[in-house]
Structures are given as C-alpha cells and as structure tokens.
Amino acid sequence: MTTRKRNEFLDLAPSDDEDNDRGYDSEAAEESKARISKRRRTQTQDDESDQSDNDSVASDEDLKLSKSKGKAKKPQQRSEEDVISDNDDEQQETSGTQYLDVTEQETKSSKRKPLDKGKPPKKNKTGVVYLSSLPPYLKPFALKSMLEARSFGPITKVFLSPSVRPASAPRRRSNKRKTYTDGWVEFASKKTAKLCAETLNASIVGGRKGGWYHDDVWNMKYLKGFKWGDLMEQVQRERQEREAKQRIEDARARKEDKVFLQGVETGKVLDGMQRKNEEKKKRKMESGDAGGQQTEELKVRRTFKQNEVKKGRHTIKDGEAALEDDTKRVLGKIF
C-alpha cells in the first residue's frame, strides 16, 4: 500500500479569502475532480491486489494439507467460476427465447381486425310519449317508477316542464313542492312507447286506493317521428326566447329607473338653487341694502313673438288680387 508523505490534518486549510480572490474556474474544478477520482481508483486497486495475494497464499496452504492427507479422494469438483459461467449461458439462452416469444406476441396483437365498412350505423329505435297534463306534485322519479311498475320499460329519459306562476299570483310560503304542467318520456323501443300510450291513455293512475294520485287520469300521446333531439331543440329555443324577453324587460326597467333617478337629482338641484336664492334675499334684507323696504317677489312675465298669419286665396278680395297682379308685372319689368 502507498503511504502518505504528508499529514493532511496538520496542514493549514486554505482561507476563504484566497478562494474568493481566485474566483470560480470550471477547468480547474474539473481537473481537481479527475485527480481525486484517480487517487481513489489507485487506492482501491492496491487494496484488491493485497487481498488477492492473501487469498492465494491461503489456497496454497489448503492444497498442501489436502495432498498430505491422502490421494485416494474423489476428483475435485468444478470451480465456482465455471458453474457461474454455465448459469449465465443458460440465462442468456432463456432470455433469447423469451425475447422471441415477446416479438411473436407483439406481432399477433398488432394484427387487428378490419372494420366492417359495409355495415350501416345502428338506427335510433327510441320512442317518445307526450303527457299533456300531470298530477299535482308528481316528481320525475315517481313517474318513471309508476310506468316501469306496469312493465312499460326500459325508460331512458324523462323531462317535465315546471309550471310558471304568474306575477299577480300570491306568494306561497308553506308549500315548497314543485308542480309540472306537461312532460315527455323516452322509451328504449318504439313498440313499448306505442303500447304504453294506447293502454294508459284516458285511464286512471290507480295504484293504492288511498294514494295521492289514485283518481288522476293519464293524458298520453305517442309522437310519431319525434326524437329526443327535436325536443331538446324546442326546449332550448323556448328558453332562449324567454331569456330574450326577460332581458328586454330588464333593460326597459333599468331605463325607467335611470330616468326617474335623473329627475329626482335635477329636482334636488333646483330645490337647492331656490333655497340659496331665498337665503341671499334674506341676507340682503337684513343688511339694509333694500332701504328697509321689503320688495315683493317679481313675477316673471314671458313674451312670445307670434308669426303673422298669411291670408289664403279664399279670404282675399278681388281688388286686392288684381293689385297684386299689377305690382308683379311692374316689378318684373324693373328687375
């Protein structure tokens, strides 16, 4: 092993000021790193060589002892290095076969079935039933369960339009349940929708005798050629119209409020001006500028200039009309 010629622990450590004066040099830093790694590599190689020498000496002693004891023993087995090399070869062969298997699996999975372009797309075979009136306070989930209990299913979609209370109606305080005016129910098949509309139309809801909806009557109609997309378009159109009307009404109300507030502000300004004028007059009267006599408020008298009314032809006399003709002729000669 190599011996250190100098003790690093007893040497003086470089000061920070010196490093700061030198600055940071990337090349110098890389060279120092390479030098340190080379030093570590040489130290590890020396340690390994020492250990190998010791192992070789010990193995020679063991061989001598085994030979002195007797030569009638079995031949020495294969060294561990040979066994390890054989195992490595087997692992390489198995890994090669596995790699081949993986490629085969990938090729099999990559082969996909071509799409059937000849088949037409599936038709929408759903049917829609319209309910013109609904029992009061009937919820969509309850309506769906009622129809499915009578084996009219499966039901895919339900839409109920809520009732809009007029502005003049009294405000409800206690009852918060919603009421619906009409609704649409979509069935998975047209056949079920037609059968439901034919059997339940103009019949009582039924169910439990003391139930809430027992005596109400179904009002159903199958909508031929009507799909759920058409309904959504209609509902969206109605909603947009309702929102547009509401926006127009809101704009009109805002405009009226703005005009009213402007009138109130102008009225306040005029009242303030009148009050100030009265206060000025009072101060003048108190100071004696008016000679101690109270002057009455001067009433404003407005004068208007009225345009002269021209006489029509039916009001003009014959002499005046002839004179006008003469004057016109004379003036025409002069000018």
UniProtKB/Swiss-Prot annotation:
Signal peptide: none
Keywords of this entry: Nucleus, Ribosome biogenesis, RNA-binding, rRNA processing
Predominant localisation class: nucleus
Superkingdom in the source lineage: Eukaryota
InterPro entries reported in the protein's UniProt record: ABT1/Esf2, ABT1/ESF2_RRM, Nucleotide-bd_a/b_plait_sf, RBD_domain_sf
Segments of this protein annotated with the region Disordered: 1-127, 272-321
Keyword RNA-binding: yes
Molecular function GO terms recorded: RNA binding
Record GO biological process: endonucleolytic cleavage in 5'-ETS of tricistronic rRNA transcript (SSU-rRNA, 5.8S rRNA, LSU-rRNA); endonucleolytic cleavage in ITS1 to separate SSU-rRNA from 5.8S rRNA and LSU-rRNA from tricistronic rRNA transcript (SSU-rRNA, 5.8S rRNA, LSU-rRNA); endonucleolytic cleavage to generate mature 5'-end of SSU-rRNA from (SSU-rRNA, 5.8S rRNA, LSU-rRNA); small-subunit processome assembly
Coiled-coil residue spans: none
Biased composition (Acidic residues): 82-92
Task performed by this protein: Involved in the small subunit (SSU) processome assembly and function, and in the 18S rRNA synthesis. Required for the early cleavages at sites A0, A1 and A2.
Family: Belongs to the ESF2/ABP1 family.
Protein's recorded name: Pre-rRNA-processing protein esf2
Gene name for this UniProt entry: esf2
